[in-house]
Amino acid sequence: MELSSRSISAVTLFVAELDRSKRWYAEGLGLDKVFEDEHSAVFRFANTIVNLLVASEADELIAPAAVGRAGTGARSQLTIGVDDVPAACATLAQRGVALLNGPVDRPWGVRTAALTDPDGHIWELAQELP
């Protein structure tokens, strides 16, 4: 099986406070929740699901690895392709979502803006420049 011909079907993010994170993804990003239980909430993002899992429940999922400590710095960034970064930023601002940076035109031909969820997961908005 060639992995390069597959798509990413799910992203699981470990969170400290599920209710706070659910609000951010539903109200801030405007995602639709498709499942919820006491330890997780799943949101649909196009063809990918974003699973928010309470960090204390993640050990079994990733053993023998361990959940990293919050507040030690970013280790990844998830990118959302959009048609118009400034317009997307304006929509997010109306929803109370603050940006880390941007919009910025990058030397590799992409306009970007970055934001962070309540648990420090970095999200980037990216638009190809003509």
Regions from the language model: what does each represent?
Residues 21, 25-26, 92, 120:
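Conserved active-site tyrosine of GNAT-family acetyltransferases
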